[in-house]
């Protein structure tokens, strides 16, 4: 598959997945077409003959596969390329692209799973299910299911924290990784703030008994420190020492 084939097919699939036909609310038959001179601005440039030939060869290959239908002028210029919906599954397979319909199914399963965990997730998940029915994107989902489910898992557990807990300890308790929460903190806070009832986004985590990890004091150079009767001589250390 050439880069031109890939680009053409992805543009056509994007149009299809963003349409009413995709969710079955279209009242008329829709077609999904792209103009090559819009996709490749130099396609009709006489000085770019190599590009013209390469694009046309790619289009011919797609026609041969049965993926597209084209309108071509007598001079060889391809006027338009239209997606053949009858072979849409083969197009996905050819591209190695996961159908949006499959992604939607998986997202719905996750949202339904977490919907009844607490009031915040009830509001958030209900809204995202509505957005999916409207063919809109799911807020805070960036095409990574593992990260997304980690976000929802944190939101499901964070309202249950009774005692003051460091972020890293909470991260280990819920996700089994001391640094995992840090990577998704901003999205977790956004969901909590937008779908919960908190007066201040900045203090939201503290209101839920989740506090920042303790800082560290670094010692280096000449000096001595006595702790519990034992003396530490910094001058004998090759590097620095951190105490939390």
Regions found by a protein language model. Give the residues of each.
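Nucleic-acid enzyme cleavage-core boundary/entry regions
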Residues: 1-244
């Amino acid at each position: 598959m050439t880069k031109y084939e890939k680009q053409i097919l992805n543009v056509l699939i994007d149009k299809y997945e963003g349409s009413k036909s995709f969710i079955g609310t279209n009242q008329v038959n829709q077609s999904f077409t792209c103009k090559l001179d819009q996709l490749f601005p130099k396609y009709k440039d006489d000085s770019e003959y190599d590009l013209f030939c390469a694009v046309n060869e790619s289009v011919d290959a797609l026609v041969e596969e049965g993926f597209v239908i084209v309108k071509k002028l007598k001079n060889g210029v391809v006027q338009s390329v239209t997606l053949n919906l009858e072979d849409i599954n083969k197009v996905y397979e050819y591209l190695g692209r996961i159908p949006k319909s499959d992604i939607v199914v998986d997202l719905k399963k996750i949202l339904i799973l977490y919907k009844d965990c607490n009031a915040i997730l009830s509001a958030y998940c209900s809204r995202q299910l509505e957005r999916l029915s409207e063919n809109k994107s799911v807020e805070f989902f960036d095409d990574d299911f593992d990260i997304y489910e980690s976000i929802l898992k944190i939101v499901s557990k964070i309202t249950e924290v009774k005692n003051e807990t460091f972020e890293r300890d909470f991260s280990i308790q819920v996700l089994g990784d001391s640094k995992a929460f840090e990577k998704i903190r901003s999205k977790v806070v956004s969901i909590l703030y937008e779908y919960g009832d908190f007066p201040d986004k900045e203090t939201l985590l503290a209101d839920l008994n989740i506090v920042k990890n303790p800082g560290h004091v670094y010692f280096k150079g000449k000096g001595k420190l006595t702790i519990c009767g034992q003396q530490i001589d910094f001058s004998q250390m090759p590097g620095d020492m951190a105490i939390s």
